[in-house]
């Protein structure tokens, strides 16, 4: 596997996934593409209207770009080539479209960690990517290494 698509957001599990993806690409002499999905939705429109300072979308985009810059810095320090992209849409659908269109040979993403009851929790986007991906998917827990909580599908 040489083409790894990393779906990244600002969460401990996602940042751990970024570190693992960079390491895998380095070991496999592959290519890395990092994608962050800005969720389109009605909530953002309401927040934009209600926020006195405005610019909710702009702040979210700046935060997303900061996450992508973090991944680019990780890759640069490891000598790994990386492409970063920011897309808007529904997360699972956008991740799958990026994986298909690139084409990725492996999708790496962070798991959601633990729910309120302390049990492992996997968000709906991760579940949908696992269900509909046509390439292997590696879900990384917040600790950074695949473990009993990590799930591989494919």
Regions from the PLM with identified roles:
Residues 73-107, 144-154:
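Structural beta-alpha unit
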Residues 33, 83, 138:
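Conserved beta-strand positions in the Rossmann-like core of class I SAM-dependent methyltransferases
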């Amino acid at each position: 596997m040489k083409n790894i698509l990393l779906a990244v957001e600002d969460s401990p599990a996602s940042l751990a996934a970024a570190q693992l993806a960079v390491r895998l690409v380095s070991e496999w002499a592959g290519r890395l593409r990092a994608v962050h999905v800005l969720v389109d939705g009605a909530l953002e429109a309401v927040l934009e209207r209600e926020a006195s300072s405005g610019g909710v979308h702009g702040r979210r985009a700046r935060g997303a770009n900061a996450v992508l810059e973090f991944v680019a810095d990780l890759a640069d320090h490891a000598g790994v080539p990386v492409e970063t992209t920011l897309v808007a849409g529904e997360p699972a659908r956008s991740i799958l479209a990026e994986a298909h269109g690139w084409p990725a040979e492996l999708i790496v993403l962070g798991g959601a960690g633990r729910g309120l009851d302390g049990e492992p929790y996997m968000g709906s986007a991760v579940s949908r990517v696992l269900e509909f991906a046509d390439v292997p998917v590696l879900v990384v827990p917040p600790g950074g290494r695949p473990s009993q909580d990590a799930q591989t599908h494919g």
